[in-house]
Amino acid sequence: MEKKYKTLKAFYPYYLTEHSDPTCRVLHYIGTSLVILVLIWAILQPVWWKFILLPLVGYSFAWVGHFKFEKNKPATFIYPLYSLASDFIMLYHFLIGKIDEKLAEAKMIIAQENKNEL
């Protein structure tokens, strides 16, 4: 299957529109924040099993958000690296108070892409 998005910059608006539900985003923020904390913990006190916690912590929150609230499949299944990077970018935009602005921009970009595909 040919992937539509070739760059993270092109992918991120799509990623945001797949995270329109506020509860889904909050679950992603929790999961991504916990991943950061577990990573720091695993680096400071290295034990192999702590590194296994990283995907478990991150994906468990994200996937509950997608399947229960957003009602879609995680973009991770098709774009794993772009999705991982986008999790951190989305958390950053939330922390600096720009997530609503970025989500509105993303919706316009994706609407234009969809219009151009017709």
Predicted regions located by residue number:
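Helix-coil boundary and interhelical linker segments in multi-pass alpha-helical membrane proteins
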Residues: 40-51
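Core segments of transmembrane alpha-helices
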Residues: 27-41
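Membrane-proximal soluble regions of multi-pass membrane proteins
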Residues: 1-15, 71-118
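Membrane interfacial helix-start motif at the N-side
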Residues: 8-29
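Membrane-water interface of alpha-helical transmembrane segments
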Residues: 18-25, 49, 76, 80
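Transmembrane alpha-helical segments that form the membrane-embedded catalytic/substrate-channel core
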Residues: 56-70
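Structural signal for membrane-spanning alpha-helices in multi-pass inner-membrane proteins
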Residues: 39-42, 65-66, 94
